């Protein structure tokens, strides 16, 4: 106690009091953040994630289990490119550690030559240092090269895996429309994946190098000052590490919240760009500015809280991991020198004592710095836990969706039931899909949205190839819902649906999608050039398809089939609709769904398109309000929007409705 009493000065007592006060404030701040999260009743924009199912973001067994699961994706085999970079980094870390030890020893000898006024020793050891500079520089830059390449390799592996799952079948559609566990998947697939990979590689480097340093310096210091010094430092590492890890636990949760708010902010900006024309017509810039500022304000408020928390943690980290570690180092290294009876220094000269102390002190300083880096790496590990939780949640949701499982808040159907009407419980996927050519048949199929809104309780009708059907009714009656069930985008809640396989059913929307690529790609989408060749369809045939929809002139206007443009902007509304019809002729499906897809096309061109579809054997389901189209159909399906429908054959006595 007497040895430490000299440190209990007024100044040190004040510092200790300030540290204690900061710890109290930090604890209070953490409690306030927790209470704010529980009491806040304002639902964030696009916050579809289920409360009560929040992913944990702490460093525990669950975190390591998740991390190992993702690492198996990024390092798929024992012998692969990623393993090679891991080995390269390990070798460079060992080499760098030996370079550090050599530089300490050589630097001590240089300074010893200066103090001893030996021009010969000074010149020799200085030339050794100059000769070693290229090798040391090469080691450092090989290490940086390996780290950067490993980050890129990890990102490529993980991105490819996630996109394989995300773009499998209709998973990308189901995630946004049938499942509400993931908000803003674009944020997860881009920024979060990159940050996760960078964090993993940085952690590998920031942990491996300090551990190597500690092992080597313990070996060197044990022979110089005994085993008690390194043992004291290791004990300090364990105690301080556990203490700081406990304090850092909120970082993981705050990282998840930060990324979620960043995703919401990106979403409102992309939404503004996508719908800029409509917003401009409505003069909605003030309202949109309020929305953007509201979301940005929420992000900024969280970032302020995060910065304050990191400031508090940084203050404590610096004291415990850096300065107190240095104090412990001084206490440890000074013991054999201040003990006048220590056998190692009984006969040492002043120059030898100085050289021995300087070398031991530098090694111990490096060792304490290595211990400090390991303690501080806990902060990066806690942040990594946040990214790991988000990536793992995305992987689990993708896996569920690809196995036909999804979670969405279902509206209670007992609340929707009408008195006296039996409410039949709806179970997603309870229906049966039968694949058959040249027929579409709904047999006691309930038409319902994914969240349980029943549009038609019991739908029954049958259509065979060659019999076109006109579908009509008010907005919200279920026309688009019918097509989504038919295209297997929405689950079948019951009954039997007989239909051709997906490739024999084609959908043409009112606003056709124009892909990135050449003019040829617009006609053959989603096929590629190789698919076109395999089908034996030449460019001359494609030209005929364009001529059929009166778009033949566009080939010369835009510079040929291989011309690359932003086709969403280059083509007018009518040209895009006619391009979609040319795409329909190319694919020649058994059935096609035309959803107001000729609204911007003249009546004569529209009539020719329908006649050509009948000629090539494409049976049509048409949503339109044009009376001129009734003559091209054999049946009509009318929905009244109140759960009733009428499916009848069109005859001379049928009253046409529309405009």
UniProtKB/Swiss-Prot annotation:
Entry-annotated residues carrying N6-acetyllysine: 61, 260, 399, 533
Subcellular location: Peroxisome membrane
Result of altering residue 572 to I: Decreased ATPase activity
UniProt-annotated binding residues for ATP: 473-480
Keywords of this entry: Acetylation, ATP-binding, Glycoprotein, Hydrolase, Membrane, Nucleotide-binding, Peroxisome, Phosphoprotein, Translocase, Transmembrane, Transmembrane helix, Transport, Ubl conjugation
Residues spanning the membrane: 84-104, 126-146, 224-244, 313-333
Known function: Broad substrate specificity ATP-dependent transporter of the ATP-binding cassette (ABC) family that catalyzes the transport of long-chain fatty acids (LCFA)-CoA, dicarboxylic acids-CoA, long-branched-chain fatty acids-CoA and bile acids from the cytosol to the peroxisome lumen for beta-oxydation. Has fatty acyl-CoA thioesterase and ATPase activities. Probably hydrolyzes fatty acyl-CoAs into free fatty acids prior to their ATP-dependent transport into peroxisomes.
Domain ABC transmembrane type-1 positions: 85-372
E.C. number(s) listed in UniProt: 3.1.2.-, 7.6.2.-
Modification after translation, per record: Ubiquitinated by PEX2 during pexophagy in response to starvation, leading to its degradation.
Pfam families registered for this protein in UniProt: ABC_membrane_2, ABC_tran
Residues with attached carbohydrate: 12, 106, 206
Region (Interaction with PEX19): 1-61
Protein name: ATP-binding cassette sub-family D member 3
Keyword Transcription regulation part of the UniProt annotation: no
Organism from which the protein derives: Homo sapiens (Human)
Gene of this entry: ABCD3
SUPFAM superfamilies registered for this protein in UniProt: ABC transporter transmembrane region (SSF90123), P-loop containing nucleoside triphosphate hydrolases (SSF52540)
UniProt keyword annotation of Nucleus present: no
Membrane topology listed for this record: Multi-pass membrane protein
Record Gene3D superfamilies: ABC transporter type 1, transmembrane domain (1.20.1560.10), P-loop containing nucleotide triphosphate hydrolases (3.40.50.300)
Gene Ontology CC: cytosol; intracellular membrane-bounded organelle; membrane; mitochondrion; peroxisomal matrix; peroxisomal membrane; peroxisome
GO biological process: bile acid and bile salt transport; bile acid biosynthetic process; fatty acid beta-oxidation; fatty acid biosynthetic process; long-chain fatty acid import into peroxisome; peroxisome organization; phytanic acid metabolic process; response to xenobiotic stimulus
InterPro entries attached to this UniProt entry: AAA+_ATPase, ABC1_TM_dom, ABC1_TM_sf, ABC_transporter-like_ATP-bd, ABC_transporter-like_CS, ABC_transporter_sub-D, FA_transporter, P-loop_NTPase
């Amino acid at each position: 106690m007497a040895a430490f009493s000299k440190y209990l000065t007024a100044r040190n007592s004040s510092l200790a009091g300030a540290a204690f006060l900061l710890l109290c404030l930090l604890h209070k701040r953490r409690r306030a953040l927790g209470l704010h999260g529980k009491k806040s009743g304002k639902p964030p924009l696009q916050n579809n994630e289920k409360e009560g199912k929040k992913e944990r973001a702490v460093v525990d067994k669950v975190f390591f289990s998740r991390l190992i699961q993702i690492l198996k994706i990024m390092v798929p085999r024992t012998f692969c490119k990623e393993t090679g970079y891991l080995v390269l980094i390990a070798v460079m870390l060992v080499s760098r550690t030996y370079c550090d030890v050599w530089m300490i020893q050589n630097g001590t000898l240089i300074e010893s030559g200066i103090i001893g006024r030996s021009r010969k020793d000074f010149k020799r050891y200085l030339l050794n240092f100059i000769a070693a500079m290229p090798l040391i520089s090469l080691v450092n830059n090989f290490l940086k090269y390996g780290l950067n390449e490993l980050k890129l390799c990890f990102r490529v592996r993980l991105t490819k895996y996630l996109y394989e799952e995300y773009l499998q079948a209709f998973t990308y559609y189901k995630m946004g429309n049938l499942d509400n566990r993931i908000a803003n998947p674009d944020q997860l697939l881009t920024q979060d994946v990159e940050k996760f990979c960078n964090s993993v590689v940085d952690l590998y480097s920031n942990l491996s190098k300090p551990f190597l340093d500690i092992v080597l310096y313990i070996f060197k210091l044990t022979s110089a000052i005994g085993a008690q010094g390194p043992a004291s430092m290791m004990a300090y590492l364990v105690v301080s590490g556990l203490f700081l890890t406990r304090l850092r636990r909120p970082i993981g949760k705050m990282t998840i919240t930060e990324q979620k708010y960043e995703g919401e902010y990106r979403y409102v900006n992309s939404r503004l760009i996508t719908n800029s024309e409509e917003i401009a017509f409505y003069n909605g810039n003030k309202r949109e500015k309020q929305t953007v500022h509201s979301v940005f304000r929420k992000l900024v408020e969280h970032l302020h809280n995060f910065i304050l928390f990191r400031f508090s943690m940084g203050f404590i980290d610096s004291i415990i991991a850096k300065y107190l570690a240095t104090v412990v180092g001084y206490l440890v290294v000074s013991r054999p020198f201040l003990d006048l009876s220590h056998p190692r220094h009984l006969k040492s000269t002043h120059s030898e004592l100085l050289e021995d102390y300087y070398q031991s002190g530098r090694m111990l300083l490096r060792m304490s710095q290595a211990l400090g880096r390991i303690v501080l790496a806990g902060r990066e590990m806690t942040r990594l836990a946040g990214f790991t939780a988000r990536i793992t949640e995305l992987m689990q949701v993708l896996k569920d969706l690809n196995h036909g499982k999804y979670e969405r808040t279902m509206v209670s159907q007992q609340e929707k039931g009408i008195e006296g009407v039996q409410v039949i419980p709806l179970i997603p996927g309870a229906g049966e899909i039968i694949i058959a050519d040249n027929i579409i048949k709904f047999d006691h199929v309930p038409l319902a949205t994914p969240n349980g809104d029943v549009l038609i309780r019991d739908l029954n009708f049958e259509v065979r190839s060659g019999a076109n059907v006109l579908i009509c009714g008010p907005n919200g009656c279920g026309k688009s819902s019918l097509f989504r069930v038919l295209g297997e985008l929405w689950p079948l809640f019951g009954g039997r649906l007989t239909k051709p396989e997906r490739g024999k059913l084609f959908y043409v929307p009112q606003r056709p999608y124009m892909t990135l690529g050449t003019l040829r790609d617009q006609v053959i989408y989603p096929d590629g050039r190789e698919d076109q060749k395999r089908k034996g369809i030449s460019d001359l045939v494609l030209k005929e398809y364009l001529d059929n929809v009166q778009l033949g002139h566009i080939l010369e206007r835009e510079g040929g089939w291989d011309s690359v443009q932003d086709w969403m902007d280059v083509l007018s509304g009518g040209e895009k609709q006619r391009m979609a019809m040319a795409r329909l002729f190319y694919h020649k499906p058994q059935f096609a769904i035309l959803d107001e897809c000729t609204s911007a096309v003249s009546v004569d061109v529209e009539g020719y398109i329908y006649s050509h579809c009948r000629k090539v054997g494409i049976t049509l389901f048409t949503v339109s309000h044009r009376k001129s189209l009734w003559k091209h159909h054999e049946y009509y399906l009318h929905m009244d929007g109140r759960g009733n429908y009428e499916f009848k054959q069109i005859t001379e006595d049928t009253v046409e409705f529309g405009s």
